[in-house]
Every structure is written in C-alpha cells, then in structure tokens.
Amino acid sequence: MEVNILAFIATALFILVPTAFLLIIYVKTVSQNN
C-alpha cells in the first residue's frame, strides 16, 4: 500500500484545523467563565 503524502497532508489538515478552531473557542469560553 503506497502512502500518498498529499492525501495524508490533506487529511491531517482537514482534521487538525477544525479541532484547533474548536479548542480555541473552548479555551476562550472557559477563560470568560473564570
């Protein structure tokens, strides 16, 4: 099974970008509550 580096990067970005965005919102919300 060959690993397509471009597909791997695209998948990583597709997962990491929304996750990072949600984490930033979560951190801001917690900071405001405190």
Curated annotation (Swiss-Prot):
InterPro entries: PSII_PsbM, PSII_PsbM_sf
Gene Ontology CC entries for this record: chloroplast thylakoid membrane; photosystem II
GO biological process, one term: photosynthesis, light reaction
Membrane topology qualifier: Single-pass membrane protein
SUPFAM superfamilies: Photosystem II reaction center protein M, PsbM (SSF161033)
Residue stretches spanning the membrane: 5-25
Domain of life: Eukaryota
Signal peptide coordinates: none
Main location group: plastid
Alphabetically ordered keywords of this record: Chloroplast, Membrane, Photosynthesis, Photosystem II, Plastid, Reaction center, Thylakoid, Transmembrane, Transmembrane helix
Subcellular location: Plastid, Chloroplast thylakoid membrane
Function of the protein: One of the components of the core complex of photosystem II (PSII). PSII is a light-driven water:plastoquinone oxidoreductase that uses light energy to abstract electrons from H(2)O, generating O(2) and a proton gradient subsequently used for ATP formation. It consists of a core antenna complex that captures photons, and an electron transfer chain that converts photonic excitation into a charge separation. This subunit is found at the monomer-monomer interface.
Family recorded in the similarity comment: Belongs to the PsbM family.
Quaternary assembly: PSII is composed of 1 copy each of membrane proteins PsbA, PsbB, PsbC, PsbD, PsbE, PsbF, PsbH, PsbI, PsbJ, PsbK, PsbL, PsbM, PsbT, PsbX, PsbY, PsbZ, Psb30/Ycf12, at least 3 peripheral proteins of the oxygen-evolving complex and a large number of cofactors. It forms dimeric complexes.
UniProt name for this protein: Photosystem II reaction center protein M
Annotated source species: Coffea arabica (Arabian coffee)
